């Protein structure tokens, strides 16, 4: 049985700012956006969250909820430096590390001899070491598989940890809402609910053949996760090459204004996901995806140096006008391709 730890730093960017400027500790602060009400919030500290300020929220809305919110532009190099230090701490306990972004990672400590092989004690020691050396807090989840470790890391935040032992898994899954499973978004969860599927236990009792017929590959993954199955290894070589968001629509759309409204709703989530990996929002390309009611899929992208909503809307409109051919649209997606790390270093050196 494997021992997987998911470590998630607590409001990481904001925590770095508060550490480096103690005057910010007790006031509501957020990273991202500006007083001109442009952009979205990348992260907010806990005083700001008490007012309802959240990641991916438009800055204008955040300022309405918390007019005295202090907005900070973000310091990518400071976050990157802290992240590298945290990664080095992980490496003291295991070589099997899969970073997901600057502020979270999976660790496989199955074969680790530290702390007598106890994943719970290893997670505790890692969190304490991070605090001692960086004055930053982290939360952790410990479980026999990756997706449960990720869910567990969110159950005792901030500055805590939660353990799901192999013996705990069946009981834990019984009442776990499907929307808590990584990869099951709000739209999918709502669609599943119309089928009477709200928890993992509901899916356990559902016919797998029907799930495969309705959802294809996603149906298989959903069924496996509901059984506690996740055979994915902690991947040391993982290098994220792209980030995307998409929405499958309950009904086909036929008007451009409807498509544009969906893009407006999707964009903040794309910006939030990109900011977790690339706070400076530098990219190689960005593009759009449309799926028509005959199930034909089309994508269009082009080279663009920085994430831009206006450019994505322009690209989407061009795709809509040139490729739709009167068909209804049932899926809208946005994506970016990340810069190759070597090319990025060369570009930065040339600035």
Curated annotation (Swiss-Prot):
Main location: cytoplasm
Annotated EC: 2.7.7.7
Endoplasmic reticulum is among the record's keywords: no
Pfam families associated with the record: IMS, IMS_C, IMS_HHH_1
PANTHER family named in the record: DNA POLYMERASE KAPPA (PTHR11076:SF33), DNA REPAIR POLYMERASE UMUC / TRANSFERASE FAMILY MEMBER (PTHR11076)
Family: Belongs to the DNA polymerase type-Y family.
Protein's recorded name: DNA polymerase IV
Origin organism lineage: Bacteria, Pseudomonadati, Pseudomonadota, Gammaproteobacteria, Enterobacterales
Gene coding for it: dinB
């Amino acid at each position: 049985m494997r021992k997987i730890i998911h470590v998630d730093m607590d409001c990481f960017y904001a925590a770095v700012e508060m550490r480096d400027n103690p005057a910010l500790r007790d006031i509501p602060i957020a990273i991202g956006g500006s007083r001109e009400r442009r952009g979205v919030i990348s992260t907010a500290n806990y005083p700001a969250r008490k007012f309802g300020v959240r990641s991916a929220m438009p800055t204008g809305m955040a300022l309405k909820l918390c007019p005295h919110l202090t907005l900070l532009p973000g310091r990518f190099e400071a976050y990157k430096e802290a992240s590298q230090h945290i990664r080095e701490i992980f490496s003291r306990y295991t070589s099997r590390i899969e970073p997901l972004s600057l502020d979270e990672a999976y660790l496989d400590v199955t074969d680790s001899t530290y702390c007598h092989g106890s994943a719970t004690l290893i997670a505790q020691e890692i969190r304490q070491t991070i605090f001692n050396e960086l004055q930053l807090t982290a939360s952790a989840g410990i479980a026999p598989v990756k997706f449960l470790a990720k869910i567990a890391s969110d159950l005792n935040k901030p500055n805590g940890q939660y353990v799901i032992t192999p013996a705990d898994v069946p009981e834990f899954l019984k009442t776990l809402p499907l929307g808590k499973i990584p990869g099951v978004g709000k739209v999918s969860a709502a669609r599943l609910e119309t089928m009477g599927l709200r928890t993992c236990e509901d899916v356990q009792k559902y016919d797998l053949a029907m799930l495969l017929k309705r959802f294809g590959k996603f149906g298989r993954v959903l069924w496996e996760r509901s059984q506690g199955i996740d055979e994915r290894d902690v991947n040391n070589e993982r290098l994220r090459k792209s980030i995307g968001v998409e929405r499958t629509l309950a009904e086909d759309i036929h008007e451009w204004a409807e498509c544009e409204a969906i893009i407006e709703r999707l964009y903040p989530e794309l910006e939030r996901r990109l900011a977790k990996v690339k706070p400076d929002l530098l990219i190689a390309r960005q593009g759009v995806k449309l799926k028509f009611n005959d199930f034909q899929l089309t994508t269009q992208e082009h080279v663009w140096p920085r994430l831009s909503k206006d450019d994505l809307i322009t690209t989407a409109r061009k795709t809509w006008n040139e490729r739709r051919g009167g068909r209804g649209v049932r899926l809208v997606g946005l994506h970016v391709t990340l810069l190759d790390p070597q090319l990025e270093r060369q570009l930065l050196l040339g600035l």
